[in-house]
């Protein structure tokens, strides 16, 4: 659990589409949810613009939101991996997911 929380505290969010650096100006006016179909409460309740503002204002809430999001994302990822292991198609699922999840948004 160290990696998701440490990266979250530094403004890096893991999503189903790739990695978001919340400190980038790109997110300043993006009022869409952190992750519309995310697994946690914070994913739909806070916008990327608001979270970016919290990071730049050095609010502790930013660290909490990012950590909760990343932990929920990793729980989702492990559940998905488990489903594909049981289904017997993990070896085809893994390379596709690694490529998708390592994309910088």
Task: Report each predicted region and the residues it spans.
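Hydrophobic transmembrane alpha-helix bundles
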Residues: 12-24, 98-105
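C-terminal extensions of enzymes
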Residues: 35-105
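Glycine-rich phosphate-binding active-site loops on the catalytic face of alpha/beta enzymes
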Residues: 1-14
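Short amphipathic alpha-helical segments, especially helix-boundary/capping motifs
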Residues: 13-14, 24-28, 52-58
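Amphipathic alpha-helical blocks and their helix-capping loop/short-beta junctions
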Residues: 17-42
């Amino acid at each position: 659990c160290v990696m998701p929380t440490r990266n979250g505290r530094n403004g890096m969010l893991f999503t189903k589409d790739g990695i978001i650096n919340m400190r980038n100006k790109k997110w300043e006016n993006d009022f869409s949810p952190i992750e519309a179909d995310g697994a946690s409460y914070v994913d739909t309740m806070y916008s990327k613009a608001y979270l970016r503002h919290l990071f730049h204002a050095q609010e502790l809430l930013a660290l909490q939101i990012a950590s909760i999001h990343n932990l929920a994302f990793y729980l989702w990822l492990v559940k998905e991996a488990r489903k594909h292991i049981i289904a017997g198609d993990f070896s085809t699922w893994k390379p596709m997911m690694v490529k998708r999840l390592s994309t910088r948004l």
